[in-house]
């Protein structure tokens, strides 16, 4: 029987399936349940995939013993399991050695519940990052919900992947455990499948990925934030090999599809992919992401060059570390047309787009886009501030015609205007910034720069507070919502414009827009031009 600690059983299952066959174990009470499970593996593992444990009393020696076992097995990952407190610190010499020699040493430490840290409890120290900078810590918190079980499994998977990533190295897995500890009535381990990991510097597609796509009925590519266009996506899309769903901030063609899916529950219901390939950075839309998380039979492949293991759609089963554009280009000749892709692509491209309820913000963006297209103004980029502005832009700038820049790495309101100012300083072309009032006043120091020129044009939507807060269910029930949470105010940007010698324009109704937009986009100016639109 295995122990009754869910996080320990998930860890045990992932270790067994990740190719770890040896563990060095040290004495201790808090890690006793982990050692029990590892011992059970020696009894229940198959003859084809045996599991061995090695008892060593001294933790400093034990970690080096594990290192030696790894060396003897052609750098196969080996675990060392220690109890809480100073026992973990004793592994540092071996961990440092493993770091500099790129030896995949997995240090598994039992830990006390986090609320006991700093309470003068025995063998209780802050163990997260205790082995830094030599080993990154992954924590397997005790899960109490289905979602927490999922993230616990992910942490164990990511730790095992980190052992092999970029030549290999040491990793720290910290396992907090509350009392009671010693109950062993679980007959079998959970079916916690590991995330398959492939690393390819030249973008050669793994055979397992080719098979996945070949077997899929409706393979979909969701493209998050990108800074430049990827032509390979259009080719795959035109050939109906993959259904490409780019986000607004991806700077790809066909972002109107994602905008449609965000706004239409009926279309989201019809989108039932069996394989999702996820590339690019952050996503703006929420509804499509939530719908895909609820698809029970969805398989997700993440392709990226950087470290980490984002499981945005909560169905990740393969991680490929590679330049995704190169990989998709090399995949293309290996794939065939998919009838389901063709059908859904046509449906999305022919579906009528529900124009948002006419407001001055949407009207202004539409008019500005029309003016830019008609007059072919040399434009470096359009910068979008976060919150309402970027969501409104999804209904207008979704055809990949313009280069869009958004601070979606963290999604904060700070720095939107500063990033646009930096772009304008480095370019001779026009930089256009759309921004809301809170973001503007928060970042107004971006304009405190005498080097800024007239190629920076700013459209400020002033609705006297954070409009996005009005769309949060239940928040309006709070008497603090308007003044204290949404940042309600009665401020105009006219004074800011005068202070920094900007040309100031304003519009208070749709009738004011045509002349104001025409001057904003055509007037020669030595300093930035600001159009404030009162919503």
Where are these regions (language model features)?
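Glycine-rich, anion-gripping cofactor-binding loops and their flanking helix/strand elements
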Residues: 71-72, 90, 222-301, 309-312, ...
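Thiamine diphosphate
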Residues: 108, 113-128, 392-535
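Glycine-rich, acidic loop regions that bind phosphate or pyrophosphate groups
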Residues: 109-159, 246-346, 450, 458, ...
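A short, small-residue-rich loop immediately preceding and capping a beta-strand
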Residues: 21-24, 51-53, 72-112, 272-280, ...
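Conformationally flexible catalytic loops at phosphate/diphosphate-handling active centers
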Residues: 48-50, 155-158, 162-215
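Phosphate/pyrophosphate-binding active-site segments
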Residues: 1-2, 291-388, 492-496, 507-535
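N-terminal cofactor/phosphate-binding cores enriched in small/glycine residues
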Residues: 4-96
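Active-site diphosphate/adenylate-binding microenvironment
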Residues: 8-11, 16-19, 29-30, 34-38, ...
């Amino acid at each position: 029987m295995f122990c009754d600690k869910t996080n320990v059983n998930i860890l045990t299952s992932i270790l067994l399936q990740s190719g770890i066959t040896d563990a060095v174990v040290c004495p201790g009470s808090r890690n006793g349940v982990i050692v029990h499970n590892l011992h059970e593996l020696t009894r229940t593992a198959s003859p084809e995939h045996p599991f061995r444990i090695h008892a060593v009393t001294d933790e400093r020696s034990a970690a080096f013993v594990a290192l030696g076992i790894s060396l003897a097995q052609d750098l196969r990952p080996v675990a060392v399991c220690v109890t809480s407190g100073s026992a973990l610190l004793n592994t540092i010499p071996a961990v440092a050695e493993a770091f500099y020699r790129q030896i995949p040493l997995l240090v598994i430490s039992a830990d006390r519940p986090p609320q006991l840290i700093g309470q003068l409890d025995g063998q209780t120290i802050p163990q997260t990052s205790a082995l830094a900078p030599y080993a990154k810590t992954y924590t397997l918190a005790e899960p109490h919900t289905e979602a927490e079980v999922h993230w616990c499994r992910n942490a164990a998977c990511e730790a095992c992947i980190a052992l092999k990533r970029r030549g290999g190295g040491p990793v720290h897995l910290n396992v907090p455990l509350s009392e009671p500890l010693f109950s062993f009535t679980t007959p079998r381990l959970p079916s916690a499948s590991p995330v398959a990991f492939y690393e390819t510097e030249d973008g050669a597609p793994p055979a397992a990925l080719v098979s996945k796509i070949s077997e899929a009925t409706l393979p979909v590519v969701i493209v998050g934030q990108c800074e430049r266009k990827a032509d390979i996506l259009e080719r795959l899309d035109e050939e109906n090999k993959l259904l490409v769903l780019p986000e607004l901030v991806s700077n790809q063609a066909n972002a109107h599809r994602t905008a449609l899916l965000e706004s239409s529950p009926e279309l989201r219901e019809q989108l039932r992919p069996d394989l999702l390939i996820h590339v690019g950075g952050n996503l703006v839309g929420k509804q499509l992401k939530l719908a895909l998380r609820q698809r029970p039979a969805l398989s997700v492949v993440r392709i990226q060059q950087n470290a980490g293991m984002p499981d945005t759609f909560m169905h990740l089963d393969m991680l490929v570390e590679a330049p995704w554009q190169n990989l998709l280009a090399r995949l293309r000749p290996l794939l065939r047309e998919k009838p389901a892709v063709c059908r859904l692509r046509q449906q999305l491209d022919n579906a009528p787009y529900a124009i948002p309820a006419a407001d001055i913000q949407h009207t202004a963006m539409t008019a500005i886009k029309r003016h830019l297209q008609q007059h072919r103004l040399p434009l470096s980029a359009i910068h979008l501030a976060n919150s309402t502005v970027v969501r409104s832009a999804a209904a207008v700038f979704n055809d990949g015609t313009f280069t869009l820049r958004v601070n979606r790495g963290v999604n904060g309101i700070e720095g939107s205007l500063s990033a646009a100012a930096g772009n304008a300083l480095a370019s001779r072309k026009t930089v256009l910034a759309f921004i809301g009032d809170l973001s503007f006043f928060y970042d107004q120091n971006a304009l405190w720069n005498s080097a800024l020129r007239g190629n920076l044009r700013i459209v400020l939507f002033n609705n006297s507070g954070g409009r996005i807060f009005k769309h949060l269910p239940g928040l309006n029930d709070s008497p603090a919502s308007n003044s204290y949470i949404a940042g309600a105010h009665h401020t105009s940007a006219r004074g800011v414009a005068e202070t920094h010698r900007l040309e100031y324009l304003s519009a208070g109704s749709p009738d004011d827009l045509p002349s104001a937009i025409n001057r904003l986009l055509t007037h020669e100016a030595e300093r930035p031009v600001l159009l404030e639109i009162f919503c």
